[in-house]
């Protein structure tokens, strides 16, 4: 029995990388289909192989996983966020952050297209970035001379996934990190202010001393798969202050003595973050019940 990490999934086949660096192509045994458990890119698995044919026998316990895209055991998720063209969208960034917090994946915010900003716009984005840094998130700017080196150092020895608003420059950033990737960059539609989807499959690619995934289906989050009562768990600044709310289980909406609303009133918590919280609360309340299945 051998052990390795799945680095590619394509049409029912799984390419597994061994500790030696060798790659073995395998398929999943029928038992996985019966149990509705599917191997994911990033999974550590036990498998057997003979005559260039292999079969996966067991999937190791996952540290975390994402559904869109299907990938497991991610160390860092780089959120490529456009500062302009398309305009910065705080609600979308917050949605991505909440989804990553819920999945127990460490986010890193990368502001792209900083060179397109006027001075006043630059100051505004700096103010926004300072707030996200103050609540514990790592932030990198595309116009920093040391940006790429800083990003490479943070990705070293880690598995990372790149995500972001369509047209934000995700593939452009990946091509800067590793020109040999040769990823197609989609032009932004001026009519829709959205980019063309150009990525087709989930693959982990070795870049220097990191494993990087460029993946499809990461332009938005349609649902949050957790109870509405857990929403404030995924806003770090809320976790710190909610203990001062008058009522235990405060939802930070209409309750008197809410420490979160008081913090918003004095500017300790930004209005945009609170607006995102309220929008996500309504989104979760409006969602139809979802029955979980194993992944």
Swiss-Prot record:
CDD domains reported in the protein's UniProt record: S1_YloQ_GTPase, YjeQ_EngC
Which terms are listed as keywords in the entry?
Cytoplasm, GTP-binding, Hydrolase, Metal-binding, Nucleotide-binding, Ribosome biogenesis, RNA-binding, rRNA-binding, Zinc
Specify which residues bind GTP according to the UniProt entry for this protein: 112-115, 164-172
Name its species.
Leuconostoc mesenteroides subsp. mesenteroides (strain ATCC 8293 / DSM 20343 / BCRC 11652 / CCM 1803 / JCM 6124 / NCDO 523 / NBRC 100496 / NCIMB 8023 / NCTC 12954 / NRRL B-1118 / 37Y)
Residues annotated as binding Zn(2+) are 245, 250, 252, 258
Known function: One of several proteins that assist in the late maturation steps of the functional core of the 30S ribosomal subunit. Helps release RbfA from mature subunits. May play a role in the assembly of ribosomal proteins into the subunit. Circularly permuted GTPase that catalyzes slow GTP hydrolysis, GTPase activity is stimulated by the 30S ribosomal subunit.
Q: Which NCBIfam families match?
A: ribosome small subunit-dependent GTPase A
- Which cofactors does this protein require? Zn(2+)
InterPro entries from the entry? G_CP_dom, NA-bd_OB-fold, P-loop_NTPase, Ribosome_biogen_GTPase_RsgA, RsgA_GTPase_dom, RsgA_N
Locations listed in the record = Cytoplasm
Q: Does the keyword rRNA-binding apply?
A: yes
A GO term from the CC aspect: cytoplasm
Alphabetized GO MF terms:
GTP binding; GTPase activity; metal ion binding; rRNA binding
**What GO terms in the biological process aspect are recorded for it?**
ribosomal small subunit biogenesis
Annotated CP-type G domain ranges read: 63-221
Q: Know the name of this protein?
A: Small ribosomal subunit biogenesis GTPase RsgA
Listed Pfam families: RsgA_GTPase, RsgA_N
Say where the protein is mainly found.
cytoplasm
């Amino acid at each position: 029995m051998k052990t390795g990490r799945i680095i590619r999934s394509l049409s029912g086949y799984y390419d597994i990388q061994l500790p030696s660096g060798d790659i073995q192509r395998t398929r999943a045994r029928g038992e996985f289909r019966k149990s509705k458990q599917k191997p994911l890119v990033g999974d550590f698995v036990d498998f057997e192989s003979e005559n260039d044919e292999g079969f996966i026998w067991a999937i190791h316990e996952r540290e975390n996983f994402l559904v869109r895209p299907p990938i497991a055991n991610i160390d860092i998720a780089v959120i490529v966020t456009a500062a302009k063209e398309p305009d910065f969208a705080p609600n979308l960034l917050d949605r991505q952050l909440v989804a990553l917090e819920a999945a127990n994946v460490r986010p890193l915010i990368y502001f792209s297209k900083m060179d397109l900003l006027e001075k006043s716009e630059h100051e505004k984005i700096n103010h926004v970035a300072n707030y996200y840094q103050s609540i514990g998130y790592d932030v990198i700017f595309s116009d920093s001379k040391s940006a790429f080196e800083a990003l490479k150092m943070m990705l070293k020895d880690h598995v990372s996934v790149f995500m972001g608003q369509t047209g934000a420059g995700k593939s452009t950033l990946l091509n800067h990190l590793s020109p040999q990737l040769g990823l197609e960059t989609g032009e932004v539609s001026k009519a829709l202010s959205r980019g063309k989807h150009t990525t087709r499959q989930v693959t982990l690619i070795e870049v220097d001393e990191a494993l990087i995934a460029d993946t499809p289906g990461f332009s938005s989050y349609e649902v949050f798969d957790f109870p509405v009562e857990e929403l404030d768990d995924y806003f770090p600044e809320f976790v710190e202050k909610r203990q001062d709310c008058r009522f235990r289980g405060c939802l930070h909406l209409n309750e008197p003595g809410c420490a979160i609303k008081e913090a918003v009133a004095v500017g300790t918590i930004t209005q945009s973050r609170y607006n995102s919280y309220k929008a996500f609360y309504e989104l979760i309340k409006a969602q139809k019940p979802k029955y979980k299945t194993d992944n």
